[in-house]
């Protein structure tokens, strides 16, 4: 075969690559000449041969290594490589490191949950005036707990208690001078400037371990435990401004629907109080035409970009008259504060307001503050009576069957702030006082409260208020003729507001034969499928 033919033959080419390797071989019994690709003209074929051999070597090495790896036992999970892999995986999944060297900062871990807010974490700032101090201080003594709470009463002038300290009161202080701030409202009073700075002045005292600053007036009555319960539901490390509106629609229009009314009280978290203290003096100069203190605070909150967080337990009570309709249909929320107690009628007829408050605080508030004034609705089926229990305050009985939808709506036993009987002037739903003399409610006010250690139950008694009533022609049992007192049994439930909001249920108990003219009832958490309806007896 000729060299040119060999170059064109595929079999010759393959043999050369896999066998000859560029050496001489025998052909037809004779020694052939030097192989064709060793010549100068076939240099590319020589390079291809070397490269192909190198790839073949790598391929064999790869198969050998893979076979050795698969045939060997798996490494233990305690190996260093596995630990490092686990650390990386945990860091990606949880954004935290399981293990880190001292020289390497760990990834940021979630902040631990703080403990529940307690009274020790709250500082009160109470606005007061020397002119009304002698009367208003009695309200503060009702709810203040000297050894459990921290706070200050900020006055405009010196009062005698500053010299001879009263241990039943908070520390008394004189507010700072505000004459440098402009005030141009024609009908207002410059004291609004002083009062608006109470939170900032209290913050600057530098008290330790403060989570919340709570503002109120000297005629504001707080329920401290309920206040702590409410504030515990918020993260005190965030900027919060918590309070409620006026009951008067016109008041909210004149001032703001975004403002917490100071008389009802409001709470400012510590970080927000710090921000307010830094900017408030500059802020006050920009609003000389505002009327009061609370609208000035809201103006500064607007500049800080913090909205009002509303809570229905703070009560401004911009109303006149009797609070019965409001208190017997309280929202399903803890009662936090009461205000304008000098303006409205005493909570219990025939008593001073301070005495009425002391009765509630000495009994129901002490026994079960979470349930105070909470409404329960049930029916006396045999007599067709509708019953509403405002626990710790009053029980109302109405002849006839009223739906829960009606009974949870406040009766207008009060007038709005502008002394008009206009139901459109309220910022909530109300219902009129019954015109039918037969449907005028019978009111049983709190008479006593105690705790039964044997049954671990609170026992509250409510006595009928005797009054002249119009003639009723209904052939239906008269509650005043059959029931003088109503006894309500209720187990304390401090965790009431840790659950989803729901009215408690009440149940009429069988009457004891030896106790005539008494009706016994039970109030507590609703049972499964229990609703307020006229049942069978």
Residue spans of the language-model regions?
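Conserved nucleotide-sugar donor-binding
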Residues: 223, 261-280
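Short beta-strand-to-loop acidic/aromatic patch adjacent to the donor-nucleotide binding site
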Residues: 209-219
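Active-site-proximal specificity loops/subdomain of glycosyltransferases
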Residues: 154-211, 225
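Conserved donor-nucleotide/metal-binding helix-loop-beta segment in metal-dependent transferases, i.e.
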Residues: 222-253
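A recurrent flexible, glycine/aromatic-enriched loop bordering the glycosyltransferase active site
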Residues: 212, 253-267
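C-terminal catalytic/acceptor-binding lobe
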Residues: 2-10, 47-64, 87, 289, ...
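Short, acidic, metal-binding catalytic loop of nucleotide-sugar glycosyltransferases
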Residues: 117-119, 139-151
């Amino acid at each position: 075969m000729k060299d040119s033919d060999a170059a064109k033959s595929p079999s010759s080419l393959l043999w050369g690559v896999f066998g000859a390797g560029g050496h001489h071989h025998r052909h037809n019994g004779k020694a052939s000449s030097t192989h064709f690709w060793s010549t100068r003209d076939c240099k590319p074929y020589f390079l291809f041969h070397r490269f192909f051999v190198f790839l073949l070597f790598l391929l064999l090495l790869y198969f050998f290594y893979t076979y050795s790896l698969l045939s060997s036992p798996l490494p233990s999970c305690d190996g260093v490589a596995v630990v490092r892999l686990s650390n990386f995986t945990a860091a990606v999944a949880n954004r935290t490191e399981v293990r880190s060297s001292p020289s390497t900062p760990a990834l940021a871990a979630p902040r631990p949950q703080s403990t529940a807010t307690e009274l020790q974490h709250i500082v009160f700032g109470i606005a007061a005036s020397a002119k009304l101090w002698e009367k208003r201080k009695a309200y503060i003594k009702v709810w203040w707990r000297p050894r459990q709470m921290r706070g200050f009463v900020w006055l405009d002038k010196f009062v005698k208690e500053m010299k001879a300290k009263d241990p039943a009161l908070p520390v008394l202080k004189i507010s700072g001078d505000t004459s440098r701030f402009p005030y141009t409202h024609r009908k207002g009073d410059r004291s609004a400037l002083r009062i608006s700075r109470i939170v900032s002045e209290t913050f600057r005292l530098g008290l330790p371990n403060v989570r919340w600053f709570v503002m109120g007036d000297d005629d504001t009555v707080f329920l401290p435990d309920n206040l702590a319960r409410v504030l515990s539901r918020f993260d005190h490390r965030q900027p919060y401004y918590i309070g409620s509106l006026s009951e008067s629609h016109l008041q909210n229009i004149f001032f703001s629907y975004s403002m917490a009314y100071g008389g009802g009280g409001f709470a400012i978290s510590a970080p927000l109080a710090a921000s307010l203290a830094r900017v408030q003096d500059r802020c006050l100069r920009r609003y000389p035409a505002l009327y009061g203190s609370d609208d000035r605070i809201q103006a500064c909150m607007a500049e800080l970009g913090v909205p009002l967080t509303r809570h229905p337990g703070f009560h401004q009570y911009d109303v006149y008259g009797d609070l019965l309709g409001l208190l017997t249909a309280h929202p399903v929320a803890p009662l936090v504060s009461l205000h304008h107690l000098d303006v409205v009628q005493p909570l219990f007829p025939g008593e001073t307001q301070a005495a009425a408050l002391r009765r509630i605080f000495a009994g129901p508030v002490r026994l079960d503050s979470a349930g105070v004034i909470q409404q329960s609705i049930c029916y006396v089926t045999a007599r067709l009576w509708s019953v509403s229990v405002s626990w710790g305050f009053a029980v109302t009985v109405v002849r006839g069957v009223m739906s829960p939808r009606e009974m949870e709506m406040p009766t207008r036993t009060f007038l709005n702030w502008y002394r008009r009987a206009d139901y459109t002037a309220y910022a909530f739903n109300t219902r009129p006082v019954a015109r039918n003399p037969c449907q005028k409610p019978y009111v049983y006010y709190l008479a006593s409260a105690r705790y039964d250690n044997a049954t671990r139950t609170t026992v509250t008694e409510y006595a009928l208020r005797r009054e002249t009533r119009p003639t009723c022609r209904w052939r239906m049992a008269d509650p005043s003729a059959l029931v003088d007192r109503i006894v309500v049994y209720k187990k304390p439930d401090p965790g009431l507001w840790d659950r989803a909001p729901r009215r408690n249920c009440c149940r009429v108990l069988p009457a004891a034969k030896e106790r005539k003219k008494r009706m016994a009832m039970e109030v507590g958490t609703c049972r499964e499928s229990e609703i307020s309806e006229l049942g069978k007896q």
